[in-house]
């Protein structure tokens, strides 16, 4: 029989008494009443905040969006297949936030900032709220530095400045993503951090963008935030805010950032789905009443910060998809009114082989002209005017057979100018190359060439000037002005190359 030793028992009791913790923790809990379609109705959670994170028994996280008199509507950040009626939920006391650090550069992450590229964890010591207030009026300064996209049509006629919000709008399959990715490629060596947010895209499309950026060495300064079409609506709704939080981290550290939201139509659809399932009253096109606020609070976070805050910037290029060119639909009109201009991509131009398919007539940049360099202003004014006159004449010429010589010349010039605006995908041009290209067109040097020869000649001209007249690029780069000296170098180079080209073509 085991002998019971009183001293051992008293020691154990003494230890237990010493270890006793008198701390009382109060946990705000609730019970699941109903769950399905990514929404859970919770009874209890009396002191929960709007937007607070809640945790279910089996580990799923949700956001409390609807605070009603007898229950709380929670949207789930996962499939929630293991959540059952009656299971318990606890409030975490936290609002959604993500870790942020330099280590995110070159990575592909989801809306919760978890890596999805299979390259291991990302170390981060700081965190930021996903929903942060936008900088106030005093914290900002007006846009004055250019953000070059590398596309002639945009940089000359619809210029974008650092800190601007410029909408890219058009039907499906008109090259909206291509314009955005070309802009990322053109930031190489410009000390700009890029964030590409893919919302509700096909996983294959996102993989294609990532591969294209990797091949050209652009992932070194880029972060990709992706929530594909099969992701829960909650995560598709959160993805743009996650991207904005990452871009803000760099902006407040005196760096320049570019963020692309591809696309906000899908985010609005995800938000509509959540709102209707939460039984919020539908408005126009069944979107909830606060869908304008959904986008305005996101896009207002893009800014050019004042000198006191370090002059960092966040430039936003939101993308919106239209249905058969209808710009007057609800989401397009909302985003047009929030942004500082729009680049309109036309399906007709795209099908006619004009790519990028930018409709220059109805595209505008409301603040970008202040950011254009002087040399570009000097050549772009004439280009814009001649293209506008050409568009008018072309419509008129369809109905008239006998045109006078001056009109024929103007039409011929317009066709060549339209040709010089065409660019291959992933082939951005430097601002000096753009200036020499536009100057060649607006000063009539292309008028003697066949339309089919224009692009071939321009490619050779850019190579020739780079090799034989490097002084031109040096003057533009240092003075940002098309000086008389630079113009004479340019004229000489164009004349020499034109003579060589015409001789080649004759052979």
UniProtKB/Swiss-Prot annotation:
Gene3D superfamilies linked: 2.40.30.20, ATP synthase alpha/beta chain, C-terminal domain, P-loop containing nucleotide triphosphate hydrolases
Catalytic activity: ATP + H2O + 4 H(+)(in) = ADP + phosphate + 5 H(+)(out)
First and last residue of the signal peptide: none
Positions contributing to ATP binding: 170-177
Subcellular location: Plastid, Chloroplast thylakoid membrane
Coiled coil: none
Entry keyword set: ATP synthesis, ATP-binding, CF(1), Chloroplast, Hydrogen ion transport, Ion transport, Membrane, Nucleotide-binding, Phosphoprotein, Plastid, Thylakoid, Translocase, Transport
Superkingdom field: Eukaryota
One cellular component (GO) term of this entry: proton-transporting ATP synthase complex
Entries under PROSITE patterns matching the protein: ATPASE_ALPHA_BETA
Residues carrying Phosphothreonine: 257
GO molecular function: ADP binding; ATP binding; proton-transporting ATP synthase activity, rotational mechanism
Membrane-protein topology: Peripheral membrane protein
Pfam families: ATP-synt_ab, ATP-synt_ab_C, ATP-synt_ab_N
Keyword Transport found: yes
Site entry: Required for activity: 363
Top enzyme class: translocase
This enzyme's EC code(s): 7.1.2.2
Family: Belongs to the ATPase alpha/beta chains family.
Role, per record: Produces ATP from ADP in the presence of a proton gradient across the membrane. The alpha chain is a regulatory subunit.
Subunit structure: F-type ATPases have 2 components, CF(1) - the catalytic core - and CF(0) - the membrane proton channel. CF(1) has five subunits: alpha(3), beta(3), gamma(1), delta(1), epsilon(1). CF(0) has four main subunits: a, b, b' and c.
Protein name: ATP synthase subunit alpha, chloroplastic
The organism of origin for this protein: Capsella bursa-pastoris (Shepherd's purse)
Taxonomy of the source species: Eukaryota, Viridiplantae, Streptophyta, Embryophyta, Tracheophyta
């Amino acid at each position: 029989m085991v002998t019971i030793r009183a001293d051992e028992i008293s020691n154990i009791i003494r230890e237990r008494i010493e270890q006793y913790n008198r701390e009382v923790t109060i946990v705000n809990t609730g019970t699941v009443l109903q769950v399905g379609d990514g929404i859970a109705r919770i009874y209890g959670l009396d002191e929960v905040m709007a937007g607070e994170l809640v945790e279910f028994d089996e580990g799923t996280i949700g956001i409390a969006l609807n605070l009603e008199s007898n229950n709380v509507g929670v949207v789930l950040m996962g499939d929630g297949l293991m959540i059952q009626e009656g299971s318990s939920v606890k409030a975490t006391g936290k609002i959604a936030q993500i870790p942020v650090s330099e280590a995110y550069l070159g990575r592909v992450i989801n809306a919760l900032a978890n890596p999805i590229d299979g390259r291991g964890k990302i170390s981060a010591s700081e965190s930021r709220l996903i929903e942060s207030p936008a900088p106030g009026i005093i914290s900002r300064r007006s846009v004055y530095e250019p953000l070059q996209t590398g596309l002639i049509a945009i940089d000359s006629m619809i210029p974008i400045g650092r800190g601007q919000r410029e909408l890219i709008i058009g039907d499906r399959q008109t090259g909206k993503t291509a314009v955005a990715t070309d802009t990322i490629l053109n930031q190489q060596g410009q000390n700009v951090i890029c964030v590409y947010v893919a919302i509700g895209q096909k996983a294959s499309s996102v993989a294609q963008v990532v591969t294209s950026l990797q091949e050209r060495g652009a992932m070194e300064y880029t972060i990709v935030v992706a929530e594909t079409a099969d992701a829960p609506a909650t995560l598709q709704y959160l993805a743009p805010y996650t991207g904005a939080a990452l871009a803000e981290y760099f902006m407040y550290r005196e760096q320049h950032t570019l963020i692309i939201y591809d696309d906000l139509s899908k985010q609005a659809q995800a938000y509509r789905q959540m709102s209707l399932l939460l039984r919020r009253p539908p408005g126009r096109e069944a979107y909830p009443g606060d869908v304008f606020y959904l986008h305005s609070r996101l896009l207002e976070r893009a800014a050019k910060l004042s000198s006191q805050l370090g002059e960092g910037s966040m430039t936003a290029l939101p993308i919106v998809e239209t249905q058969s060119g209808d710009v007057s639909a609800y989401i397009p009109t909302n985003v047009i009114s929030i942004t500082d201009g729009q680049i309109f991509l036309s399906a007709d131009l795209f099908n006619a082989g004009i790519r990028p398919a930018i409709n220059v007539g109805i595209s505008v940049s409301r603040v970008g002209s202040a950011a254009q360099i002087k040399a570009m202003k000097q050549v772009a004014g004439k280009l814009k005017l001649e293209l506008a006159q050409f568009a008018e004449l072309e419509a008129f010429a369809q109905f008239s057979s006998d045109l006078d010589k001056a009109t024929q010349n103007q039409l011929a010039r317009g066709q060549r100018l339209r040709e010089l605006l065409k660019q291959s995908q992933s082939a951005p041009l430097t601002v000096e190359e753009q200036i020499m290209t536009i100057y060649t067109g607006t000063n009539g040097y292309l008028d003697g060439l066949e339309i089919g020869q224009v692009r071939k000649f321009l490619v050779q001209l850019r190579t020739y000037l780079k090799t034989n007249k490097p002084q031109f690029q040096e003057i533009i780069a240092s003075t940002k002005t098309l000086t008389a000296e630079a113009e004479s170098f340019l004229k000489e180079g164009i004349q020499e190359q034109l003579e060589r080209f015409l001789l080649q073509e004759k052979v």
